[in-house]
């Protein structure tokens, strides 16, 4: 049985004591935290999801420990607030004085869903995308990075050119990491990637839709090299995007390995 706490007794705060080893810690905090998150979707609605969170701060050499419970308290504060890139950045900025830190990072990884209409029949279904938001705060300055993994179809130009009929095609993952401004929307980045693939994906297709996607991919063949270059060209031309990295992996249907390419800009 727990003994009662005497309010007259001051409990020791060990983590606030001085550390004598004089070794600063670049990142300390919590990771692997599954916590609800509301994301402001492209249609303006608040989409509920569950994110995997990592929150860390830098710890000066003279401090023994950080305030671990305050990370979770910060998550709880924003649990019911629809999150935007700008608000996510503000959350990272708020974390620093709360933890008495000069710099810190917040990362949230979560599934995001878009309701899509099939290209011919118009039947609607959800498609999921793996997203990651990263905010890096130094004082009042915050850098926001958006990471999106977009599944698409790719069709091989060489296979089409040498075959009398048909061409091998496969599902591909295009992962874009980009420094974006606070007004940037996830849907815009996803749409940009899908536009540059041989064809986009849908959760539900009828026979007329299957005919469309088969012929669409055949008319728009792309190597993995074409895919990353075309996406990179679009990112370079976008005024709301800074540094970026485009990674494409084609899960080859005629090999037991993937084709892979990366462009950084």
UniProtKB/Swiss-Prot annotation:
The gene is folE2. The record marks 156 as: May be catalytically important. It comes from Bordetella pertussis (strain Tohama I / ATCC BAA-589 / NCTC 13251). It holds the Pfam family GCHY-1. The lineage of its organism: Bacteria, Pseudomonadati, Pseudomonadota, Betaproteobacteria, Burkholderiales. Its EC number is 3.5.4.16. It catalyses: GTP + H2O = 7,8-dihydroneopterin 3'-triphosphate + formate + H(+). Converts GTP to 7,8-dihydroneopterin triphosphate. GO terms for biological process: tetrahydrofolate biosynthetic process. GO terms for molecular function: GTP cyclohydrolase I activity. Pathway: Cofactor biosynthesis; 7,8-dihydroneopterin triphosphate biosynthesis; 7,8-dihydroneopterin triphosphate from GTP: step 1/1. Keywords: Hydrolase. This is GTP cyclohydrolase FolE2. Belongs to the GTP cyclohydrolase IV family. Transmembrane segments: none annotated.
């Amino acid at each position: 049985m727990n003994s009662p706490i005497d309010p007259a007794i001051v409990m020791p705060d060990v983590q606030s004591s001085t550390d004598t080893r004089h070794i600063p810690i670049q990142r300390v905090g919590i990771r692997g935290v599954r916590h609800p998150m509301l994301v402001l979707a492209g249609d303006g609605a608040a989409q509920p999801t569950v994110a995997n969170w990592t929150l860390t701060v830098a710890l000066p050499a003279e401090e023994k420990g950080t305030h671990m419970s305050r990370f979770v308290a910060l998550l709880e504060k924003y649990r019911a607030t629809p999150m935007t890139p700008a608000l996510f950045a503000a959350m990272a900025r708020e974390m620093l004085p709360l933890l008495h830190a000069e710099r810190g990072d917040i990362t949230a990884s979560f599934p995001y869903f878009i309701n899509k209409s099939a290209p011919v029949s118009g039947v609607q279904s959800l498609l999921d995308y793996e997203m990651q938001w990263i905010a890096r705060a130094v004082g009042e300055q915050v850098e926001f990075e958006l990471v999106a993994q977009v599944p698409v179809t790719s069709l091989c130009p060489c296979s089409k050119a040498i075959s009398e009929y048909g061409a091998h095609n496969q599902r591909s993952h295009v992962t874009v990491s980009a420094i974006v401004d606070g007004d940037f929307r996830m849907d815009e980045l996803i749409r940009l990637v899908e536009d540059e693939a041989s064809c986009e994906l849908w959760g539900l297709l009828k026979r007329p839709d299957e005919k469309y996607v088969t012929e669409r991919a055949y008319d728009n063949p792309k190597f993995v090299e074409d895919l990353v270059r075309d996406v990179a060209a679009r990112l370079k031309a976008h005024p709301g995007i800074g540094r970026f990295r485009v990674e494409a992996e084609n899960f080859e249907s005629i090999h037991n390995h993937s084709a892979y390419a990366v462009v950084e800009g």
